């Protein structure tokens, strides 16, 4: 489990001091909960995020243990180091919005016919309770030929999950190479 500290002082000076000591600044929030300003060791946070098997993982901040989902993060444009992360508390029974990654499987037929596979959506917006949250959407592109596309409406959605993205939006497609 990832352990962090609660930041008492908020501001640029305090954040810079924590970053200098190897901490990652984080905000933790959720519906009906008070926001928590936290900090995690950067290397520990990266290890924990890489080894997790689900979108939801546990963190301990101060005396609280919370199940959270990574909502957003900021990286340094030059060094690509993590600078900041936003975490949303995944509460059981509370319907909330999440971003779920898309995994593509198979090799499209259109690639052999001088086509190019284009993935226009890497994450899809869904609305569901934390216990119904899928880890990813798996799309099989093996039947796609040049000019074909898989739309949001073509994705099989588990029970209790609602898609927020429009039905007509293309997720992945094969286009003719120029």
Curated annotation (Swiss-Prot):
One GO BP: translation
Keywords: Ribonucleoprotein, Ribosomal protein, RNA-binding, rRNA-binding
Coiled coil regions in record: none
UniProt keyword rRNA-binding, yes or no: yes
GO MF annotation list: 5S rRNA binding; structural constituent of ribosome
Alphabetical list of InterPro entries matching this protein: Rbsml_bL25/Gln-tRNA_synth_N, Ribosomal_bL25/Gln-tRNA_synth, Ribosomal_bL25_b-dom, Ribosomal_bL25_C, Ribosomal_bL25_long, Ribosomal_L25_dom, Ribosomal_uL5_bac-type
Pfam families, A to Z: Ribosomal_L25p (PF01386), Ribosomal_TL5_C (PF14693)
GO cellular component terms attached to this protein's record: cytosolic large ribosomal subunit
CDD domains reported for this sequence: Ribosomal_L25_TL5_CTC
Function in brief: This is one of the proteins that binds to the 5S RNA in the ribosome where it forms part of the central protuberance.
HAMAP family to which the protein is assigned, alphabetical: Ribosomal_bL25_CTC
Similarity annotation: Belongs to the bacterial ribosomal protein bL25 family. CTC subfamily.
Cited PANTHER family: RIBOSOMAL PROTEIN L25/GLN-TRNA SYNTHETASE, ANTI-CODON-BINDING DOMAIN-CONTAINING PROTEIN, RIBOSOMAL PROTEIN L25_GLN-TRNA SYNTHETASE, ANTI-CODON-BINDING DOMAIN-CONTAINING PROTEIN
Known partners and oligomeric status: Part of the 50S ribosomal subunit; part of the 5S rRNA/L5/L18/L25 subcomplex. Contacts the 5S rRNA. Binds to the 5S rRNA independently of L5 and L18.
Record-given protein name: Large ribosomal subunit protein bL25
Originating organism: Campylobacter jejuni subsp. jejuni serotype O:2 (strain ATCC 700819 / NCTC 11168)
Origin organism lineage: Bacteria, Pseudomonadati, Campylobacterota, Epsilonproteobacteria, Campylobacterales
Gene field: rplY
């Amino acid at each position: 489990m990832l352990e962090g500290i609660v930041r008492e002082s908020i501001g640029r000076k305090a954040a810079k001091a924590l970053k200098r000591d190897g901490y990652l600044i984080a905000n933790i929030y959720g519906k009906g909960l008070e926001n928590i300003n936290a900090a995690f060791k950067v290397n520990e946070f990266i290890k924990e995020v890489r080894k997790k098997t689900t979108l939801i993982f546990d963190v301990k901040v101060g005396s609280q243990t919370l199940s959270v989902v990574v909502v957003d993060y900021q990286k340094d444009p030059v060094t690509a180091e993590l600078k900041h992360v936003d975490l949303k508390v995944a509460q059981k029974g509370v319907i909330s919005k999440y971003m779920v990654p898309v995994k593509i499987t198979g090799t499209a037929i259109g690639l052999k016919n001088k086509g190019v596979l284009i993935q226009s959506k890497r994450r899809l917006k869904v609305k569901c309770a934390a216990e119904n949250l899928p880890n990813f959407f798996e799309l099989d592109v093996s039947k796609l030929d040049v000019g074909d596309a898989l739309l949001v409406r073509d994705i099989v959605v588990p029970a209790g999950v609602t898609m927020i993205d429009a039905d007509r939006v293309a997720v992945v497609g094969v286009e003719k190479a120029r």
